Swiss-Prot record:
Name of the molecule in the record: Motility protein A
InterPro entries xrefs: Flag_MotA_CS (IPR000540), MotA-like (IPR047055), MotA_ExbB_proton_chnl (IPR002898)
UniProt function note: MotA and MotB comprise the stator element of the flagellar motor complex. Required for rotation of the flagellar motor. Probable transmembrane proton channel.
Subunit structure: Each stator complex is composed of 4 MotA and 2 MotB subunits. 2 A subunits and 1 B subunit are thought to form a single ion channel, so that each stator complex contains two channels.
Statement: the UniProt record of this protein carries the keyword Ribonucleoprotein: no
Localization, UniProt: Cell inner membrane
Coiled-coil regions listed in the entry: none
GO CC term (a single one): plasma membrane
Keyword Phosphoprotein: no
Organism: Cereibacter sphaeroides
Family listed: Belongs to the MotA family.
Keyword entries, A-Z: Cell inner membrane, Cell membrane, Chemotaxis, Flagellar rotation, Hydrogen ion transport, Ion transport, Membrane, Transmembrane, Transmembrane helix, Transport
Amino acid sequence: MDIAAAIGLIGAIVMVVGSMIYAGGVAPFVDIPSLVIVVAGTAFIVLAMKPLPVFLGHFKAMMKVFKPSRFDMNEVISTMVELSNLARKDGIMALEGKAVPDAFFEKGLQLLVDGTDEAKLVKQLKYEIKAMKARHEAYQGAVKAWIDIGPAMGMVGTLIGLVLMLGNMSDPKSIGPAMAVALLTTLYGALMANVIFAPILNKLEGYSADEVTYRELVIEGLRGIARGESARMIEDQMVCALDRKQQMKRKAA
């Protein structure tokens, strides 16, 4: 579980709600019609903008913020070194059925065992990365739509409230409360976009970039094995993807 994501999102919500309570209670900040305009209105617009599978799938994608896939770069380097040594000793066929960390690595290894040449191997795996990025970007686009449309729907709700307020100016005492209700939709739109969806989008983009880096590292290692390069050379090439601290730790091991 991504503790930072959970603490950050929960902490931001607690701070906002806490300030409302401190200012006099949550009740003045709750208005059901305003919530419907912002949340339901934004949801329907996002649905209109995106294909149904993407709209339904992006909710599941957002849950990955709290439980993302983890990619251990050190593990994949160590595994690649072992496979390289085995391939140089017993041949490529000796790699068949060997345990690897994930499905992408397994597919690449199977292509290698099946005798796929280096160029075709790289092309196929690069296509896999391209397809993955397209899926991720589709879901991220749906999340971004919430960020873009939410505040706009908040403004729409505020304008509706102002029209209703200005249409009933006979009672001056009602103007203040009516104005407050009108402004709530703007508040809801800003909170939804910046407190909830913006951090989620940023996390998803980061996780996607990490997965691309991991997969490119796998390709680099498999390419080295296909070329018959030494395990040391493959390791030196792959270690470049690690940060300085991890490089030093691996060198000392």
